[in-house]
Amino acid sequence: IDEQISAFNEGMNPSADATVTYNEPMDSFVLRPEVYGTQLDADAVCAKVGECIKAMRTNCELTEDDLIKPKVLSSDSRVMDAVQRANDLFPDSFSLMLNGSVKAATIDKATFAGWLSISPEDYSLSISQDGVASWVNEKAEGMNTVGATRTWTREDGKVCTVSGGTYGWKVDTNSLSQDVYDALVAGGATSVDIPCSQSGDTYNGAGARDWGAYVDVDISEQTARYYDASGNLLHSCGVVTGKPVNGRSTPTGVYYL
């Protein structure tokens, strides 16, 4: 009768154990109660049918006792403890700080929930290191400023845009991934400092000015201007840049001096 039971169960609702789940409106890990389904327990049904055959009965009545039941109930202290540990492990938010004080990215609890898994055997918590690394790699692309397009208002009021160059911030993604993972596993931390393989003077987000004192070489005006970190013009002079033909034009971008 296994085939008949399998066919019957296809249209029935399965049972489910009580477990830990993330509740988005509450922004919290909560207990998801067990579910009592309507699928038949093949072992229980076969045993009852065997008894009916031995008793020479022509019919066999099945009851709720013959349905598959959840094995883990809401009253199980292991589940409640896992809920508490999951909430204790992660604060309301987790910040990634660049240049000491700039919040460059934030991990919210919904994102963290996507990395968290709970063992059905011992209810231990584990965090996906691959999930963390993938998220960090994606965010780091938006933090890096080396070669990025930057727009700023020059001290004389001209709005300037520049792309390319070797100057700027470059996040050490491997180190950052490990730092974030270690902090989340340890629990309780609210931020990590972002390690960089290359840094600038300031950080105001991708696409913004990230330098202090600088020399502005305006190719369109054929003028070089030197500004200090406070924006004071210290020197200005005419320049002759490369001829705008292949191999001779002056490369644009932001570079170290």
Features from the language model and the residues they span:
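Surface-exposed, secretory/extracytoplasmic low-complexity segments enriched in Ser/Thr/Asn/Gly/Pro
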Residues: 1-257
